[in-house]
Amino acid sequence: MKKTLMLLAMVVALVILPFFINHGGEYGGSDGEAESQIQAIEPQYKPWFQPLYEPASGEIESLLFTLQGSLGAAVIFYILGYCKGKQRRDDRA
């Protein structure tokens, strides 16, 4: 029980601490930062690829990004659970 509470406190600290460390800071995406750095280094650079789908707003883009991450996590944890269940079944046999 003590170990669980300690781990939970560490997770909460990791979630909340960045907001206090970077108080008033801007949380921007890495795509925009990369684009500005490329333009600073090579102003004539033209992207060689365009997105297949451009979301209508930033909120929809965030939603799609979150769904993509959730789906990836679901697949990973399904595979881990399947392997664990298979291992338990083999141990019983």
From Swiss-Prot:
Tell where it localizes: Cell inner membrane
Q: Which InterPro entries match?
A: CbiN
Nucleotidyltransferase as a keyword?
Answer: no
Biochemical pathway: Cofactor biosynthesis; adenosylcobalamin biosynthesis
Query: What GO cellular component entries does it have?
Result: plasma membrane
What does the sequence similarity comment in the record state about its family?
Answer: Belongs to the CbiN family.
Q: Which NCBIfam families match?
A: cbiN (TIGR01165), PRK02898.1 (NF002780)
Question: What is the protein named?
Answer: Cobalt transport protein CbiN
Give the source species: Salmonella gallinarum (strain 287/91 / NCTC 13346)
